[in-house]
Amino acid sequence: MKLLIEKIKLALQKRTGTAQQKKSHDSWVAKGYRKEPTVTFVLQSHDKSLQVCHVLPKLRQYADAEIIVIDDGSKEEHTRRLAAALTGANEFLLRANDLFENVTYDKAIRLANGKYIALMQDDDDFDGTGWVEQAVRLFEQHPKMVILGGKGGLDITFEDDRKRAHGGASQATGDFCFVTSVNRAPMWINRQLFMQHLHHIDFRFAPFQFDDYELCARAWLCGLQVGWYDAGFRSLTAGGMRLWNNAFTQEQSERNGRLLYQLYADERDRIRQRVRESNA
């Protein structure tokens, strides 16, 4: 019945010449859509639309960018708020239902048109756009760098007795350096290098945990580089979704720690040698 009513309504509009808004090429151009922006900001949101709306005006200060918000929660109020807030021609809403970051970040990377992609969390906060400009400069200075982290720059610890791997000691020094791995967020991606050499975030680590370490290890073995700088982020919340999912997080840490070990324990020396050579 609803479809029939809608069909009649549209037929009347067409016959009478009334429409919601007249479209034209000029009105489309006036939207200011950028086909190839320098930067794509990707924000993963899990029922934290207020936090996302807080940082949107800050992200818009960097003009040559697009914004993709992943609405990965389960509450309709957040979907409505985000849809209302994303008003620009280069602002998009990607809807998912509790799939978590492994899947949704990978989807968003394929949607993004930016040369450099910043993967962000819904509790990230920052001042100004200096962290963006610095990241772009670092990518331009290091054409083999596929990943740039702005949070932690870490070694990967391999526990041979337990056959597990996880984030290890900090390797971050100075204003910038190459490191074994970085964790989110932000995590910057050189999109062209990612698509040519890495192709995807490893789905075996879904729904979350340690896929960022795996991606970094794979990058080094592909002859690419992973860098770190201090983005100066701070948190808007007391803890992310893991605060309420401790058992789930522990389960994922055990499972993915074993997988990370299986994949890269035998490659640890080669990876670390490439990090040392890059920093030389």
Q: Where on the chain are the PLM-derived regions?
A:
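N-proximal low-complexity "stem/linker" segments adjacent to membrane-targeting elements
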Residues: K2-P57
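Short, acidic, metal-binding catalytic loop of nucleotide-sugar glycosyltransferases
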Residues: P57-E66
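A conserved acidic beta->alpha catalytic loop
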Residues: I70-R80
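Glycine-rich, basic loop-to-helix element that forms the pyrophosphate-binding segment
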Residues: R95-A112
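A recurrent flexible, glycine/aromatic-enriched loop bordering the glycosyltransferase active site
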Residues: N102, A169-R191
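Short aromatic/hydrophobic "clamp" motif used to bind/position activated sugar donors
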Residues: I117
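Conserved donor NDP-sugar-binding/catalytic core segment of glycosyltransferases
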Residues: T129-R162
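A short, conserved alpha-helix in the catalytic core of glycosyltransferases
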Residues: M187, Q192-H197, R204-G232
